[in-house]
């Protein structure tokens, strides 16, 4: 961890292995459902983080990028998980046919890349992860928006 405030945490991640380690740490302290919005430019590591988090939660199958399918569902060791990539969505109304009702399950892990493209159609984020370029590596910052997100942030602060 490189910095901390009451509302957020930040890390410098020198490589993809460090990104995967942060995701694995999150998986280890996750004890409830969570809605996590993933922000960052193309190639910043949103899908890599989501893939590492789902893998650490023992999905037991290859974690695919939902770039073309828009949504992929998984069963982790103790909860349903959904990974959405809304990059190709031009209007949130396009999400109506996806049947997003399952995302409201409080036990579910919901990972959303490009959430701004689904504004108004998505559940509220507990946490948001902002990934950006930092030299050859990445800078990751997490911000909490709910009590659930704040509890997870407190557990992650020990990383």
Regions found by a protein language model. Give the residues of each.
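P-loop (Walker A) phosphate-binding loop of NTP-binding proteins
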Residues: 39-41
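Phosphate-binding P-loop
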Residues: 26-33
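Short phosphate-coordinating micro-motif centered on Lys-Gly-acidic
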Residues: 1-9, 55, 90-95, 101-159
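N-terminal pre-Walker A segment at the start of P-loop NTPase domains
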Residues: 2-25
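Short hydrophobic/aromatic beta-strand immediately N-terminal to the Walker A/P-loop
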Residues: 35-37
